[in-house]
Amino acid sequence: MNETQDKIDLLDMNRLPEHVAIIMDGNGRWARQRALMRSDGHVEGVNSVNRITRFSSDLGIKYLTLYAFSTENWKRPQAEVDALMHLIGWTIRKETPDLVKNNVKIHLLGEIDRLPESVRRDLEDGRAATAHCTGLNLNICLSYSSRWELTNAARKIAERVKAGTLLPSDISEETIASELSTAEIPDPDLLIRTGGEQRISNFLLWQCAYSELFFTPVLWPDFDNDAFLEALIGYQSRERRFGMTSDQVSSNNTEHSSGCDSKSE
């Protein structure tokens, strides 16, 4: 039995995170360690995207959100930005048939209008081609930042107040959440960052309020199924309390388990 299967056997398949978000960091360092161009690291990173997307789908994870290109990434050298834009469009065109085959549905988050027209067209074609899929929801964050998202949500809420359709006293957490680009997506249960840095870099700040955080030194191009399983095993080893005590969580879990047992009898 290989190492991957050994790790799969350690998982409780009934307690997998519904939603996993990943900050894919380390492409540039991976390339530098091999005396390659940064663009080579990004190309290799695409292989990891394909690998983890397929594996997430196979495991039955419902939502996978990938931080592919941040608002801040526009500040990178123009040659690198151009290479990334080309790679994004090429990857979507190439991988869409396999996504359809594997029942994976594409969602796009971020300021998509800022992307080059050809890339937008490729992305929209991919989204349209997978619109009927009912398996894994693949959320691709492009030209995205959480501060942009929250500012945009605040602006929309202010417009509703100005129009008289919303009272300031009626603004709630649900009101804000409904104006985010993730309005129809559950909050991440697990946020993974590869590459060794331990920060969340303006990514899903609102949505990750109660997410479990997993930081790994593994560079994104090297992030394979075994590394992903280690993150999932780490997630399942934690107690998610959401402000409650351990005793309360234990009691709720026992009641839920008893209820499930009763229904199955």
Where are these regions (language model features)?
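Flexible, compositionally biased loop and terminal segments
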Residues: 1-265
